């Protein structure tokens, strides 16, 4: 997911996206623990996507406050 895609989302959509990513991260960690994970790089991708969503949500909140 690109940062431009995330910037186009509303605050509610960002919250939903964050929840989806956290669920995916949980499932990936579970698969890794049980030895079923095929693409281990996906864990890092999801972690960075979560950081992007949180960063942009914080920026939007700061802009709305200012």
UniProtKB/Swiss-Prot annotation:
This is Large ribosomal subunit protein uL29. PROSITE patterns: RIBOSOMAL_L29. GO terms for molecular function: structural constituent of ribosome. PANTHER family: 60S RIBOSOMAL PROTEIN L35/50S RIBOSOMAL PROTEIN L29, LARGE RIBOSOMAL SUBUNIT PROTEIN UL29C. InterPro entries: Ribosomal_protein_uL29, Ribosomal_uL29, Ribosomal_uL29_CS, Ribosomal_uL29_sf. Signal peptide: none annotated. Keywords: Ribonucleoprotein, Ribosomal protein. The lineage of its organism: Bacteria, Pseudomonadati, Pseudomonadota, Alphaproteobacteria, Hyphomicrobiales. Belongs to the universal ribosomal protein uL29 family. It comes from the Bacteria.
